[in-house]
Amino acid sequence: MSMASFKSASKRISGTENVTRISANTAINSIVKKGELNVISLKDGNTADLEGINDVLLDYRRILKNEIKTAVSPITMKLKKDEHKKKLKLGTLKSITDKLRKLGGESSQPFIQFYKVQCMYIPLFSRVDGDNGEITVSLIDDGKEAAGQDPIIQSITFDASQMAMVELSMNFFVEKKDMDFIGIHVSAENVPVQDRAYGSINLAFFTNEQSVPMMQEEKKSSYLMIDAVNRPNDITKSSVFKSIGDRVSEEINQKRDDYKKKLIENEKLRRREGKGVKIETETRSSSSSDGETLLEEARKSVSLNISKFLADQRRAPPPPQLEKRTFQWPCGVKMLTMMDTGSSSHYFFSKNITPTSVEMNFGGVAQLEVERAKLSFETFGNKFLLKDVFMFSDQSLGDNILSYTLLKEEGHIDGMRTAGDDVLLEKDGEVVMILDSRDEGRMWIKDDVWAEVTEHGSKSAREYCMKVEKNEIKVE
């Protein structure tokens, strides 16, 4: 396949104008120079982005050695006689996760965090003159396909005669009951091989079972062209996987000392860095329906674009001895704080939830009762009075929710950024509140894709809350 046709295919499927192709040798030199084991992602402008893809080369070795227990290894693909294209469904998120669960035991968590899937492809035929065919690997949502929508979450096409590592990612959580909808498909077109295996694929899903799904930054798909080692000619058996993995790993290990030295330098730099959060707001549709209020119409769709920046010492967070984000009821029950950015698709899960007869829910979790209330408190010398907050009725859960939208609309804050594990709410450049993203508080962010796939026809928690009588609750 020519470079022109390769770029055309990639533009058609991934939507990027140019595709970065980096050999393993080039990638190794690059990660040593930058002190990173993040290798590549597809970006406009034909540039390599070393952010966001986790240890592709190291994962490559672990997959080939079957050290990643979620790997399916290997799968061989054939074209029948007179067949120019072949489609295969390699597996689903459920089938892979079930295998992992048998190894690690049953979990009661309701969500599967699915952050990437990797496919290691090795061609089993020799390169020939002319077009060598194309391989397309796709991350598919069968539920969307059944609904008549585009099912492709991410997809990438590459040269069928070239050994490669392909990585695709999602940035939302999947409920266990929906895991069978998420699958990996591979298709081959114009491969010059018939009646025998033309390729072999190792497949690995990277998953994590969670109780509270924290959205993460969207990643791009990646394509690592493995040409640092010579691909054996006209292979017919898959026994070469281990030897190829060892050879690529050996090449990485030769650079390990240089990498560690640069990594230490980068760690020192990171200690002086923070992460900035840019808030982009978009007003929702003003079309009203029965029961909808002005407050509901005013809700914002908030997206967070995370970008690194060198922390400005003039805007440093308050010293750690200051009181942080932990409020207490008069009865002595401590309250943890969660930031609500305006999304109706947030979830909360607790094993200790006691079902009630009132069928109200927060973000789709059945029988978790919530109520709308007023909340006043004081922190860092600033007094806050929120007209509307959404709180769990069962105080033993120990959580309340603050609304970023309302805080901003009522003039309490004008911006938000992060520093380390903290989310900083600011006004006029001064920090007025800190939320801890670890145990002492939680920040929930919006994800439009997740909101789409979790729409099951039920009303949002916010619509339920509008019908609940306000309560006057003061937190000292």
Curated annotation (Swiss-Prot):
Q: Which organism is it from?
A: Citrus psorosis virus (isolate Spain/P-121) (CPsV)
Q: What protein does this entry describe?
A: Uncharacterized 54 kDa protein
Q: Per its UniProt entry, which superkingdom is the organism in?
A: Viruses
Per UniProt, the ranges with Basic and acidic residues bias are 274-283
Q: Where is this region: Disordered?
A: 274-294
What Pfam family is a match, any one?
A: 30K_MP_core
